[in-house]
């Protein structure tokens, strides 16, 4: 068995950076989906049922992706990175399109796709740390992941506030549709998700 080499601070930084995008997208979803459902006409008693996507997709997708990513090898991207990329592409597209949903069923379907896509990226990204780092550096790797998770969550929470209070966007649209600040927030989240995952893919071996 080959001995794993110790990595530098910046190499570990690069490995964990993708979680910034993952948590940015996840945080936008968690903070805004109920409002999106309400804008589309969902009643308060329907919203808990519409939120079933997150736990259900986690239960289904995580073990499947974990199994597959353990056994997948791409000649260019390697073991886990194909899943980083596939999940990031689908999650980013879904984030951008989500605020343009025209009906509750459409937003609910988008949420299922988004949660599945996030899980496709997230589970292999977690496992990547254990694949690459020696045991003595694992705690440092997981700490770095937690750091980027925290940063992503903060950015997701601040983005709508920034657009409303600093940029001066309107909180309510004139036609009663999903407001522009939500659309811009999800656009930034989608771009950030893909950019962060691409950074990790291309800066790590």
What are these regions (language model features)?
Residues 2-57:
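Helix-loop boundary and gating motifs at the non-cytosolic
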Residues 47-73, 93, 151-157:
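Central cavity-lining transmembrane alpha-helices of secondary-active solute carriers
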Residues 71-87:
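Cytoplasmic membrane-interface "Motif A"-like loop-to-helix N-cap segments
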Residues 57-59, 139-169:
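Glycine-rich segments within core transmembrane alpha-helices of 12-TM secondary carriers
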Residues 112-148:
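Cytoplasmic helix-loop-helix junction between adjacent transmembrane helices
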Residues 160, 164, 168, 190-205:
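C-terminal membrane-cytosol helix-exit motif in multi-pass small-molecule transporters
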Residues 20, 87, 91-121:
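Hydrophobic core of transmembrane alpha-helices in multi-pass small-molecule transporters
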């Amino acid at each position: 068995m080959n001995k794993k080499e110790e990595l530098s601070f910046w190499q570990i930084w690069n490995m964990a950076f993708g979680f910034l995008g993952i948590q940015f997208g996840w945080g936008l979803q968690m903070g805004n989906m109920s409002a999106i459902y309400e804008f589309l006409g969902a009643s308060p008693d329907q919203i808990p049922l519409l939120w079933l996507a997150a736990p259900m997709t986690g239960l289904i997708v995580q073990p499947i992706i974990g199994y597959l990513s353990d056994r997948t090898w791409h000649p260019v991207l390697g073991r886990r990175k194909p899943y980083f990329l596939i999940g990031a592409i689908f999650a980013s597209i879904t984030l951008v399109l989500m605020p343009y949903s025209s009906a509750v069923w459409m937003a609910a379907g988008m949420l299922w796709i988004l949660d599945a896509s996030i899980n496709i990226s997230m589970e292999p990204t977690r496992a990547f740390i254990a694949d690459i780092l020696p045991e003595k550096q694992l705690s440092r790797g997981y700490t770095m992941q937690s750091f980027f998770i925290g940063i992503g969550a903060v950015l997701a929470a601040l983005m709508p506030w920034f657009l409303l209070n600093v940029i001066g966007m309107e909180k309510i649209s004139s036609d009663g549709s999903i407001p522009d600040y939500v659309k811009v927030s999800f656009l930034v989240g989608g771009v950030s998700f893909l950019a962060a995952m691409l950074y990790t893919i291309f800066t790590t071996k």
